[in-house]
């Protein structure tokens, strides 16, 4: 898996990330990973669903990975949820 095929979801509008995913597949990628942490997780899920249902034919969800990351803040360590959604256009 090439790191260039990873879309990191943040606070921008969802369609920006959808365009990034569609562009990766248009450029010949066989897999694209959508990653997000914390409050951006719902935006990542929206990105994957919009890309699959409205723009990409023959692409499917390969894997969804959820985890918890421990990050250092000013007030100490805190846990942040994260998600990785792997999309692929390789047939089953």
From Swiss-Prot:
Any Pfam family hit: Alba
Keyword Cytoplasm appears in the UniProt entry: yes
GO terms under cellular component: chromosome; cytoplasm
Subcellular locations according to the entry: Cytoplasm; Chromosome
Highest rank taxon of the organism: Archaea
Keywords: Chromosome, Cytoplasm, DNA condensation, DNA-binding
Disulfide cross-links: none
Major location category of this protein: cytoplasm
Biological processes per GO annotation: chromosome condensation
Gene3D superfamilies per the UniProt record, alphabetical: Alba-like domain
GO molecular function annotation: double-stranded DNA binding; RNA binding
Cell wall biogenesis/degradation in keyword set: no
Family assignment from sequence similarity: Belongs to the histone-like Alba family.
HAMAP family named among the record's database cross-references: AlbA
Function comment: Binds double-stranded DNA tightly but without sequence specificity. Involved in DNA compaction.
Protein name, per record: DNA/RNA-binding protein Alba
Classification lineage: Archaea, Methanobacteriati, Methanobacteriota, Stenosarchaea group, Methanomicrobia
Gene: albA
